[in-house]
């Protein structure tokens, strides 16, 4: 007989600094309410993201009814990648009036390649348009 499939109790989505998960909020309370072993998750997440230190890495945690879990790492948010490429701390408070930085289309394509697996796009050109739209909404000008 095939093994029984575990029943899903919930999905938790978090954005945590790579290699820096700890039981403090927001990680502890989010996992605690589902009865997950918090330290076990922190150790597994930190080991999986050690090579990406300095980035915020979104994670989707599937919690099962027997309190076990598994997680899937996503790519860093497009906004964070754009800020890093533009060399600024934060986007514009008035994006369509005040532009805070400029990025080239090559930089946008590079970010699109990184984000491709998480974007709802069929090819790099469509993904680049999505990233360019994010840049515009942050007050970052995209130069052709």
Curated annotation (Swiss-Prot):
The alphabetized UniProt keywords are: Methylation, Ribonucleoprotein, Ribosomal protein, RNA-binding, rRNA-binding
**Role, per record:** Forms part of the ribosomal stalk which helps the ribosome interact with GTP-bound translation factors.
Protein family (similarity comment): Belongs to the universal ribosomal protein uL11 family.
Quaternary arrangement and interactors, per the entry? Part of the ribosomal stalk of the 50S ribosomal subunit. Interacts with L10 and the large rRNA to form the base of the stalk. L10 forms an elongated spine to which L12 dimers bind in a sequential fashion forming a multimeric L10(L12)X complex.
GO MF annotation list: large ribosomal subunit rRNA binding; structural constituent of ribosome
Entries under CDD domains matching the protein:
Ribosomal_L11
Q: What is the lineage of its organism?
A: Bacteria, Bacillati, Actinomycetota, Actinomycetes, Mycobacteriales
**Per its UniProt entry, which superkingdom is the organism in?**
Bacteria
What's noted about post-translational modification? Answer: One or more lysine residues are methylated.
UniProt protein name? Large ribosomal subunit protein uL11
InterPro entries in alphabetical order: Ribosomal_uL11, Ribosomal_uL11_bac-typ, Ribosomal_uL11_C, Ribosomal_uL11_C_sf, Ribosomal_uL11_CS, Ribosomal_uL11_N, Ribosomal_uL11_N_sf
Tell me what organism the protein belongs to: Nocardia farcinica (strain IFM 10152)
The cross-references to PANTHER family, in alphabetical order and at most eight, read: 60S RIBOSOMAL PROTEIN L12 (PTHR11661), LARGE RIBOSOMAL SUBUNIT PROTEIN UL11M (PTHR11661:SF1)
> A Pfam family in this protein?
Ribosomal_L11_N
GO-annotated biological processes: translation
The GO cellular component terms are: cytosolic large ribosomal subunit
Q: Identify the Gene3D superfamilies for this entry.
A: Ribosomal protein L11, C-terminal domain (1.10.10.250), Ribosomal protein L11/L12, N-terminal domain (3.30.1550.10)
